[in-house]
Amino acid sequence: GIKYSKFEIPPEIIKMWRSIGIKGQKQKKIWNDKLQKSPPSVKKEFKDQIEKFIHPSVFAKLNELKADLREEPQSIATRKASEICLKYINDATAITLGGSADLTGSNNTKTDNINPVSAEAYGRYIHYGIREHAMGAIMNGISLHGGFIPYGGTFLIFSDYCRPAIRLAALMQQQVIYVLTHDSIGLGEDGPTHQPIEQLSSLRAIPNVSVFRPGSAVETVECWELALENKTGPSLLALSRQNLNEFRQSLDLESKYNPCKNGAYCVASNSKKPEFSIFASGSEVNIVIEAYQELSRLNREVSVYSVPCLDYFNSQDNDFRENIISNASCNIVVEAGVSQGWDRILRENGIFIGMSTFGASGPYKDLYKNFNITKERIIDVILNSK
């Protein structure tokens, strides 16, 4: 048995432990001396990299992309828009370190301008394997070390496996970015095992986690911009598998202005004081806009708000929120998930159109119809409201 008393460390173990520290001290001195002898430009570059400084030129490139997407709108999945955005980001800076939990082809996380990490060569992309929690834990370590902003991809449904790592990133205020694709019943035939229902709500419930769910290509660029700016916690991008129409081409906003930073903003309105305000995120914004167009023809007074980040909206000052929430007689929320978390907007007389059961297998358009998340449902609710 052990011959030592409680909390007594054997001398040989102490010696071994301290020898590791002494070796580390020597290596640290060698490294610091080398850095001090380096040219000022090298020292600045190293300091900027360690502190994860993003040069303004990166955001300028994103503004160029945003302007292009507004001028030539595309109907694409937001996961594809994210890939386009990442190519611009990975081209403009060496600070990003990507990866995926064996879903690279589906998450669209690897761009052609970065190479995988290997034993033989430096790279900026990690194939984590089917290990979502390990991916999250490794990204936390990368962020804590400094020098890189890690981003990793998986399906939104598998965020449950990442949850402890996401929570720790939030607790430690670490900048870690998750690319969570296949974000609703819109993923289609993979069925209820892969269709997230409660995930958006449960992730939003974690303090200091920013959940972004863009509804178009332009919003995807803006959400990536906010994720890069968010230095004090994890950012999660929930992205669609199905194509979504662009709705920002006709909105009179300067290309440099990012309305997503407010969490919610008006994308369509036919009245300063409408009967109904409809709030939606992600793919459901397209559905709501279709309903709005029909309701306008029927002379119903309606405003439509895109809510790309409910967390950001809830963090705005009370006056800002009240001006939006209290503007209409009744608020309607449309999201292909559960209603939890939308209470501040719904209030007592609000109407929620979304999910309360597991999904099903089938073409995504059939599923939206089956679960009654359609423009017809929205129109019917408004026309039949007292």
Residue ranges and their predicted role:
Residues 1-8, 12, 97, 104-200, 220, 222, ...:
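Thiamine diphosphate
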Residues 97-100, 128, 151-152, 178-180, ...:
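General beta-strand structural signal in soluble alpha/beta enzymes
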